[in-house]
From Swiss-Prot:
Belongs to the tRNA-modifying YgfZ family. It comes from the Bacteria. The lineage of its organism: Bacteria, Pseudomonadati, Pseudomonadota, Gammaproteobacteria, Enterobacterales. It comes from Escherichia coli (strain SMS-3-5 / SECEC). InterPro entries: GCV_T_N, GcvT/YgfZ_C, tRNA-modifying_YgfZ, YgfZ/GcvT, YgfZ/GcvT_CS, YgfZ_barrel. GO terms for biological process: iron-sulfur cluster assembly; RNA modification; tRNA processing. This is tRNA-modifying protein YgfZ.
Length: 326
């Protein structure tokens, strides 16, 4: 990608975030084009893509035959097919898996590094973009296309926008916003996704979890009414037989080091500590607070105390902006 990522600054929680323009270099874009695109994706992901309109984007999972996620995909219609955004660390293996059956279909599946991914969030993000685009996405119309640019709207943790565009437009936006907006890199967007409870699947956790273990059903990413797709049997069993005992949790507090994706944490049990969970992502904010996204048992007590392994500091559960009640 020729567009240079912005230098990192310590991320800020959404409630205190000034207007910020971010390069999303840790995320990557991929596309499927061709006459069979919709039919092909319908047989591969957990969401009902046949019901998706041009105005929608959604988080879907791409699973193996056992229902474990290769990755999750932020999916939207693009040209005569679909595009999706996923963590850069999983794109290549995810595309390899997706292409396995493509030889029998009229589709082309490819990474897209020509386009640039930017995020805009923070104080008066909408007002800042309203000067630059004739229409912005909203709750009613979550995807808007203008020229070479696609804008995606997100409600949580606070209104923000993901921009998929060409290099020239990315440079124009940077020049226009440079004076009023702080510039930051992917870590700020990652912090917002953790706060929003959007599961982050990096390479360390690819092939490890069924979608429900990361709350995908609560985010509208699983259709239980559509026809078959890879891994469907296991995903359905988890719902209808209550086979899923895990959920995605948000922890905040302090830690002397950031836990890495794939690492476990420790849960306080009386005087002792017991290993628990799998970390998906963690970020340290500019106020020193650590935010951790972790998959753990879905029956954790809300006042449980956790820590990074052998650490002197502690972490506690924070509520997510959505409900897991079915």
């Amino acid at each position: 990608m020729a567009f240079t990522p912005f230098p990192p600054r310590q991320p800020t929680a959404s409630a205190r975030l000034p207007l910020t323009l971010m390069t999303l270099d840790d995320w990557a874009l991929a596309t499927i084009t061709g006459a069979d695109s919709e039919k092909y994706m319908q047989g591969q992901v957990t969401a009902d893509v046949s019901q998706m309109t041009e105005d929608q984007h959604l988080l879907a999972a791409h699973c193996d035959a056992k229902g474990k996620m290769w990755s999750n995909l932020r999916l939207f219609r693009d040209g005569d097919g679909f595009a999706w955004i996923e963590r850069r660390s999983v794109r290549e293996p995810q595309l390899t898996e997706l292409k396995k059956y493509a030889v029998f279909s009229k589709v082309t599946i490819a990474p897209d590094d020509e386009r640039v991914l930017l995020g805009v969030a923070g104080f008066q993000a909408r007002a800042a973009l309203a000067n630059l685009f004739s229409e912005l996405p909203s709750k009613e119309k979550q995807v808007v296309k203008e020229g070479a640019t696609t804008l995606l709207w997100f409600e949580h943790p606070a209104e923000r926008f993901l921009i998929v565009t060409d290099e020239a437009t990315a440079n124009m936006l940077t020049d226009k916003l440079r004076g009023e907006a702080e510039l930051n890199n992917s870590q700020q967007w990652l912090a917002l996704n953790i706060e929003a409870g959007f599961p982050v699947i990096d390479a360390a956790n690819s092939g490890q979890f069924i979608p429900q273990a990361t709350n995908l059903q609560a985010l509208g990413g699983i259709s239980f009414k559509k026809g078959c797709y890879t891994g469907q049997e296991m995903v359905a069993r988890a719902k209808f037989r209550g086979a899923n005992k895990r959920a995605l949790w948000l922890l905040t507090g302090s830690a002397s080091r950031l836990p890495e994706a794939g690492e476990d944490l420790e849960l306080k049990m009386g005087e002792n500590w017991r290993r628990t969970g799998t970390v998906l992502a963690a970020v340290k904010l500019e106020d020193g607070q650590v935010v951790v996204q972790v998959v753990m048992n879905n029956d954790m007590e809300p006042d449980s105390i956790f820590r990074v392994r052998d650490d002197a500091n502690t972490l506690r559960i924070e509520p997510l902006p959505y409900s897991l009640e079915e």
